[in-house]
Amino acid sequence: MCIRDRFYAPSSANSYLSADVISASNTLASTMLSFYCSTTGLANKGVLQDDNMTGINWCTIPVTIVEMGFMSNPEEDQKMANPEFQAVIAQGLANGIDAYFGR
């Protein structure tokens, strides 16, 4: 399963997003991805930085998007449709959030 975790990192020198938010978003993304993969047993494919996510361009707090798989991939689609695996996915995400906030 392909896992991607994205956060907004502006490509321009005159960014409207602070370095603190970018750094915190990177930490959030990396932490969530690590715990998500260790909980689900899925491969960690790394963090993808992307500045094309218009829905999160103006965030003032750490932000990340977790792609948990691709419905276009029959194996991933079947796994994500399984209620038992959905619970594992939720636990992995919760573990990452808890770790980020130091719980």
Predicted segments, located by residue:
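Active-site-proximal helix/loop segments of hydrolytic enzymes
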Residues: 4-103
